[in-house]
């Protein structure tokens, strides 16, 4: 269990919260063609020469320090490619350099932008109603929670309420790759929340949208995207087809955990419309230009201008200035500028695409390695932050003074929170049980959030907390009777206060202490036997008490073996081996689910043994020991139950 507890990973970001139901979007304002603004004194002009030199000064060092094999970066401006560059290797062993126009990258969830574009095309064609029950378009039924139908708007804003899922998310064996239809029908995700109520990012929901595109268009999803988006935008080296077509396969970049390691296999994304695109930086330049030009690229038009502007028109915004989802596109403010886009991650590829519509600028970056200590995540974030600070700097941040009773409010909201993007069904729930956000009230009346490092927040208005010397904000509200924290930087998840029984500190303490007690019990068992043989005059327990003592010790060993089995199931997550979670693992998981009889029986035996120890009048040392062991056996059942290790669900 010590090893099992070490598996607990941070898996659910904090996020954002609705203040209303998603109805029809407000009309987007007309976009004035971008006009180059005069740079702030001391701010370099965004030119090809300056940007190219700046990238040359930053990216090679980032690759070397982070053990990242290669990266592509493309910046467009005013309808033209400003800079496109490749650094490092697409194939380290083969010394194949990164070619922005030919080398394909896996862009993960950035693929969703093509899915949402396809949906908007079919809205234009009158084939999809954003506010209709999606069951209208499906050949299987999703029973809505609380009777509130799921709409396409809900899917596009990640407010369908689906819980997260891991099973069949990725594969490496083409023989195991399911169609989107099969995946959706066999892996239907439960709803944690009624549709429209709470944001919870969902690959399942995005895959549903792609399947609806197939259903209403009459074309396979990959073919639809090729015919209606990629071809008009002259993107011949982009595809959703998996495995890659032979004509493109030779140009696919290798994917690495670290540049000094062997490459991993090609990652097959089972929720294809949610993340299976392979593309080049050169092709993505065309996509960015089209979005910045209201759907137009050259002589092609993939969306009407008024429809394209919906990607900059949030359906729901919980608070002015907060990030929001606009028909599948992230909308946020960076340095006071509107930024529209989407990031994307597979296990080894890490991508981001950001558009500044008001400046006519697009920024695309894709790394082919996770890097040492997940360096690609930080490198990706820092690169765009530095780009914005260099070319579009923010005015000095001024944090308003705190309101009078901020310190009292800080104490009231301090505690543990779980993300709305989580799993409650199946054994993966254990991760979300143990890893939670902690909000701490500081002595100066500010609060700190464990997942937002090195930042403090000051209450500047009732229930509104702002980063000290920064723009980030937190809004305190309530949904479904639970205190909820909305992060201005995250529109796809919220933090929800946990009840005492789900408190991660409590459960870690119960689990950790229980394991230590059971380990001691198991290890001391042979010691006790040796003492009996060595000192035969010692008092010996006999009869039923002896049998119960034996069974209690056996239960301790059985519980440790049971937890060891679950560790073997959960350990691949530590190595990012998500592809192992498929039907091939069902037999082992079912065996462990049946084996839950071991800790359940052990808890009963432990209590029985403690009761017998007291009833037979044994000494206080034996009594205390029996109670501690019984509590430990009960503790294992507690954590197993709270972490959904006890149950028979194979959909996780």
Predicted region positions:
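Sec-dependent signal peptide recognition
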Residues: 1-6
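Short, well-ordered beta-strand elements
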Residues: 342, 352-369, 483-488
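Short, surface-exposed loop or secondary-structure junction motifs
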Residues: 84-92, 144-357, 378, 383
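Peripheral terminal and inter-domain segments
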Residues: 377-652
